[in-house]
């Protein structure tokens, strides 16, 4: 069975749809909830909803042009994403058609996994 970081690493972000972002202050740390519809892997024919919680978030940046996100929603408003690991922290960068998300985090979990 794959762990959550492996599941997220296999996601095909291109042409995915950003549905919701949320920040939560939980036990003196910030967590970030990302709800997307993405292709789970290369063999998946349709998008699946994923709810991913990033824990211990630091250095959060988010810029979004809402009109562009909405205009590109049916075709997919996510261009691509990459997760890097350095100095015991992860960093995710999500490029959108109409903006970007970028933040570092300590760990993540897939809350709702349809795989």
Where are these regions (language model features)?
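Surface-exposed, interaction-prone regions used to assemble/regulate multi-protein complexes
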Residues: 1-115
